[in-house]
């Protein structure tokens, strides 16, 4: 994982995605996305070249995507959920099928992500993968003389009040692996298994300083000395903390780690489809990919594009083309009973 964000000379790449044509008629894009995916460093060149103005609203959990679209989908043109949620939006009829022949760099994307059931279904494409990584754990180096290797550290009573967990149902997954072994299929847990997971997470609650919702919130918890250890969006928050000279260490637990991939989707009946398609092409172009990776420290979906801006050491550090690493992660997919998982997680948070 990255200890600091990459410095990438985007200007040397040029406006490859949208800069080869004249600026189109102006349009607007309202997007619902994660922090880091609409940084001005790469959004402004897109806006200048395309004539499309982008406005972002940020989420802290995948559960926000269906909730916000179901109650006001017309407010957004594009969304970027993880691939365990893209299929939910498809089933709800909230997103458009895409013509991959109009996506210039589609065939350069990793096949594992192009063919993921959250991206392609029934011979149609419903998402454009942009970035991927792990749900790692991270800790303040000076607080742990002995480096932790297991997720069980998150239940260590000596760390009471110094632990933070992501406010997301995926906390169920790592807890299930601890209880039932790392080979358990965490997306099809039985009622009995989910009850045991709930009990384990409720037992953890007195140790939790706060369930974090956004990258910025977690960074502030560390910067203020309120927490010493948490789970994390691998590479991103640790890089933000490194910029404040706070030395963090990331690790993948011996119980195995979640893998995630995020994909942009076009909202059903968007009136701004032309600008939306320009953005979808841009985010998987050399400039878009290098911009996203440079800001977030995540791995990119288009390794061909990234070879133009990453050194060989950076490319290796991000596990680009490291299929052994990719396959070692438990890549998210939609739980068989997603509503039940959300119910369990909400019950954990509500427990006294």
Q: At which residue positions do the language-model features occur?
A:
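Periplasmic-binding protein-like
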Residues: 194-204, 244-268
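Ligand-binding "clamshell"
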Residues: 90-97, 121-125, 240-252, 314
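A ligand-binding cleft/hinge motif common to bilobed small-molecule-binding domains
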Residues: 85-88, 229-247
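Early extracytoplasmic/lumenal segment of secretory-pathway proteins
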Residues: 26-88
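Conserved C-terminal helix/tail region of periplasmic/extracytoplasmic solute-binding proteins
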Residues: 324-352
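Paired acidic/hydrophobic, glycine-rich loop segments that form the ligand-binding mouth/hinge
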Residues: 76-81, 211, 228-233, 249-250
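Mature extracytoplasmic/periplasmic domains
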Residues: 262, 267-326
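Extracytoplasmic ligand-binding site segments that recognize negatively charged/polar headgroups
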Residues: 80-86, 90-219, 223
